[in-house]
């Protein structure tokens, strides 16, 4: 489902001349998830120009000339940068590969590259694989006749695998089909065996995974073709063999050597020679989804003998697990759905994910299919407007199906918007076109029965994750041989080669389509006229497991698509059947229940339900389905997710809070799309901006939406401007804006200007952001404005200079509305006093901000002058006893009504307690004190208890979590509990007071019969209450951050 299109991966060449770039751009070291470069070593080599790489290889040959198995220029002349890295790691194990690389760059006068090489080796040296001084440099010694056989084998491989795709199978037998390669897959080819971090080891097993039809088999055949041309890792001198799993999994037992001999008839001696050097074997295994037997995962059942005749499942499992031929290199082509089956057998596999067509390749395919015509432009614009449909086109064969289906509609003169109201309807139009000529010989009743049987077969197999369908499956679905023959003729089903009674759906898309159709078919003559979806199966269809897409996601899309009334009408017309909306009513009952029981987890992307609702496209249905959505967490990474999110958010009537993570660089997409439509605005970029505006409009139209959190996000100027405009809209009722780990460029005039443009905004949080001077000046300006109604400002872990913090503190004075300021994990050092001087503040938190005992005197002085402060937290600063003494001395002389003081984790000891108890007895306003995580120990707590006995001490809440005291002080504490009439909450958790201490305190506690609302926390007993579970007063809530729970 995902269709993220990252920027081009084109290498940036460098030169060794004086004009060489001053640095290697950081992005050139990164790789997209699932790329063969991910976690690769020496990635900087891909930035080497062609001329420089050729020079590097010439110098490398000189280094290799002393080996027992020298490399020739013919073997490296066409080698890619990744193959050169592979050769380096292979011939120079451990750090020697980096030393040789650095030396060669030094000879080439590439000083900057030498620095980069040294930086990498220093980073990975601790985890690097130890040097093997006995590197095996052996090869198979072949006689002339044997070399000739290998040459003939390579010739046969080139003939067999060119063209790369098979024109005799679906959809190659369709006249308008044409093949277009996926450029990124071509780039992946030479990188498949790139050595990986952290050990710098060359992968011996590579699992190439991807969606059905994405191009795994084509890539495998491309590897074989390039190997036969000596263009794929030529320095390895491999013998490569491609096996479909059905070749291995025969009904009769066979040995692996016999499998090889089938490729080389009459070459038994040659096979034995090759098998004696298994490190020179390259084995490609494909077709796991068509296996009709189960893989074996019990090691004791496997075999290491390649001469032994074995059942197919044992032979295949022995190869996958490296029990047999552990030195051989394996390339495995596998679907996502087969990964869990194979994963337990594989040892240290390197995972490569094939992404399919990117946006540019999809556009190119449409343009090549339709030509550069007005009709082609209309179809392309229509497809790009439907982002779900366009994202499905990343699979090449699906892209062709969509083009073919839309072309049929254009040829009939149909309006695409009306005839194809959603993505599902495009597939309805195409797939139904396979039926008429072959179905017309059936009576209507037979046609209905055969269609039901096909749908039943598809549904059962989808629920059971079954791709190969046997005789029993056909019988269960009541699909007779006549129907099977008909569907084989339509290319909807395909018989597995060598398996007389086993079939697969020709395309998984067909299987998903007919499985969903099963639940909308109507049978008026029956008592129950439709097949009911169970509660569990509905949950499976709309689930988003761990943030990824379920293998049932397309089936779920098709189901909801069929339930769109216009699409349902197209189904009835195209398939000559009736449609039931019975499951539509059930969906409306089940969806709210699922959301209540299992709400989406943070970071899980866009919920699968949102895609399904976008596909049904019916206002009333969508609004009712989203009735219980009060908070939505979305991770948006592509244009499809923007469009779908906008559609659904606008229909969440009771939405209160939105959390957005925007991981797509909108500006890159804008430029990329525009470059494909020179002279005009690209449909995708135009649509993307429109959909983003649509999403932002939710803040202006939903008067219940009060909270927006932006996390890990980057927004280009046009998109940030659109968001800010929506937040400034007069109808926007947003009260809280939280910016966490966003790009610093987002703190610009547009977004900060929202503080004066929105009169409802009361809370602003900026967290984990580099705050630049320009942003602070803007913030200071709006904070001084009388139109700024902000009441609470939270700045956490913000990278800024001391001057910036000083300027901010000085500029807060002019804001009469700001009552709460939370500063956490910021390097304030000597700037803390500026914030205590802000006259209008009632609540101030300066936590973990590098305050020290040296700053406490100025802090205490400012505290004395404050008139409004009720809550102060200086938690997680190393104030020590000497610094805290200034705070204690200030408490009796305060002009402000301070009620809560938090000195949690401030490096205090029992030495500060004498000053503390004096202050507590003299200050009449302080009600709550948090001293947790300080080393008060028994002596300090005993002194504190003496103060609490004093009737002048009005403290109601005392928190002493993890203060390192024991049962020794419990007698004094019990005595205090008997006499103190004010204390309502006492936290003693994480202290080793033992059973004796607990019993002593419980006795004192239970003796206070008149005290009905005392709560205290002690070790082992989470909470003990006397008659009432009433929590401590809400005014004094909180642990380390006494202000974190404040609502605007």
Curated annotation (Swiss-Prot):
LRR repeats lie at residues 815-838, 839-861, 866-890, 923-950, 980-1007. PROSITE patterns: DAPIN, NACHT. Residues 33-131 form the Pyrin domain. Changing residue 1045 to L: In a colorectal cancer sample; somatic mutation. GO terms for cellular component: cytoplasm. Residues 1-23, 1029-1048 are annotated as: Disordered. InterPro entries: DAPIN (IPR004020), DEATH-like_dom_sf (IPR011029), Leu-rich_rpt (IPR001611), LRR_dom_sf (IPR032675), NACHT_NTPase (IPR007111), NLRP_HD2 (IPR041267), NLRP_innate_immun_reg (IPR050637), NOD1/2_WH (IPR041075). GO terms for molecular function: ATP binding. Residues 204-527 form the NACHT domain. Changing residue 126 to R: In a breast cancer sample; somatic mutation. The keyword Ribosomal protein does not apply. GO terms for biological process: regulation of inflammatory response. The keyword Amino-acid biosynthesis does not apply. SMART domains: LRR_RI, PYRIN. Residues 11-23 have a biased composition (Low complexity). Keywords: ATP-binding, Cytoplasm, Leucine-rich repeat, Nucleotide-binding, Repeat. CDD domains: Pyrin_NALPs (cd08320). Involved in inflammation. Belongs to the NLRP family. This is NACHT, LRR and PYD domains-containing protein 8. It comes from Homo sapiens (Human). The gene is NLRP8.
